[in-house]
A protein has these predicted regions:
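Single conserved hydrophobic/aromatic residue that forms the stacking wall/gate
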Residues: 1-8, 12-13
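Glycine-rich phosphate- or other oxyanion-binding loops that anchor nucleotides, phosphorylated ligands
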Residues: 14-188
Length: 188
């Protein structure tokens, strides 16, 4: 659907990641489906960088973690909690997972111009979808529940599965990245 906004859009990669390339306002743009989670998103970013890409925008979905983050709102991430494993292959855990400020500001400007309700802030990034949704069924459920409460108290806006990896991979590769998400449900 996003690729339909591009002029002269053509599918250029079919095997691992479906990718369309075309132009938008006379700028060459590629749209890639990376699948779910940090590992596949990191592979896509690495391979797209090798093809010359230098700016990335992750568009996806998330679950709201604060009561004012409603279904249908947009969340623009200003940082990500590294509760996943991919980013650890690129940088020590002390290194922050933060997006490029210019890309983030452009995302905020775009969301404002459309009049969508939105929030900016930190998101929680994890590897397991069901660990969060059914922690009581997991051997580490106690830890998951306590971390969830800590993230909420610290003001974390939403939960998703790619940003931390993409932010750290982008830092390691010297490219720009930002992310925004449609809230599909509020988990509170």
């Amino acid at each position: 659907e996003i690729a339909s906004c591009l002029v002269g859009s053509e599918m250029c990669i079919r095997d691992r990641y479906v990718t369309y390339t075309g132009t938008l306002d006379q700028v060459k743009v590629s749209v890639t489906s990376t699948g779910i989670g940090g590992p596949s998103a990191a592979i896509a970013m690495e391979e797209l960088c090798r093809c010359g890409a230098d700016t990335f925008i992750r568009i996806g979905t998330c679950g709201g973690m604060q009561t004012d983050v409603k279904s249908g709102d947009i969340v623009v991430s200003t940082g990500a909690i590294r509760m996943e494993g991919t980013s650890r292959e690129y940088a020590p855990i002390e290194f922050p997972a933060v997006p490029d400020l210019t890309v983030t500001n452009a995302l905020v400007k775009a969301v404002k111009s459309k009049g969508y309700p939105f929030h900016t802030g930190v998101v929680q990034c994890k590897d397991s979808f069901y660990g969060q949704h059914e922690p009581e069924r997991k051997p580490v459920g106690y830890d998951l529940l306590h971390k969830w409460e800590a993230w909420k108290q610290l003001g974390c806006l939403a939960s998703e599965m790619e940003s931390a990896a993409l932010f750290v991979v982008a830092s390691s590769l010297g490219v720009r990245v930002g992310s925004c998400f449609l809230v599909i449900a509020n988990q509170e």
